[in-house]
């Protein structure tokens, strides 16, 4: 990177958006000395995407961000979900590393660490070897045995592949668990947003997520859901208690906006 008297360098961190998450959400229930001495905490990722999505949600619903409770899910090969209250991150699924949280393309998501010594004994793998499997050979790929790509998973599921269906069902199940937890954390939501490759394009996933949530007031419009395309779309029915949105991630635009704000002073 080159600098001169007429240029400046701007660093845009993917972690910055969740920097003021409350301690009760960002810290792990381990000895507090670990957290303080070794910075063991939930850092949160996809922050640039979430900052952009939050602003677009405010614009689409016609209300200031400071007046909104938003649950946003960035679903792709790396997936996470975040709860925002008045523009502030109050909880997020990725943690100390991007391995924690939702089931992903090749990452396991949440995993009981007590399995480590058991797998080490059974397979002969060391810790780096196990972490490699959890990061690159698990998730949709590991369960389905087919692919990390949700499009391939759905196609195989429709052909009757039981492992592909299991992978799809697990992905949706974990996502729904987090969605329910964040609805309780926020005390409800004004908008639920899907972004990222799977979030934007996999209408079957969105359909499965909301398939039984009408009693909670979250009502999907099936036609809008299947037709959703472009930069942004509302896929909720008129009777839904929250706006259900699909917003295309535009992290480059968010980085450019941040750089412009800094340059403008």
Listing of model-derived features with the role each one plays in the protein:
Residues 67-73, 128-137, 191-193:
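Beta-strand segments within the central parallel beta-sheet cores of soluble alpha/beta enzyme folds
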Residues 1-10, 14:
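Single conserved hydrophobic/aromatic residue that forms the stacking wall/gate
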Residues 8-9, 187-197:
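Short glycine-rich phosphate-binding loop at a beta-alpha junction
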Residues 20-122:
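Glycine-rich phosphate-binding loop of actin/hexokinase-like ATP-binding domains
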Residues 123-167:
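A mobile "lid/hinge" subdomain adjacent to the ATP/sugar-phosphate binding pocket shared
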Residues 165, 169-185, 189, 199-265:
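Internal helix-turn-beta structural module
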Residues 84-85, 91-126, 132, 196-227, ...:
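Catalytic phosphate/nucleotide-handling subdomain of diverse soluble enzymes
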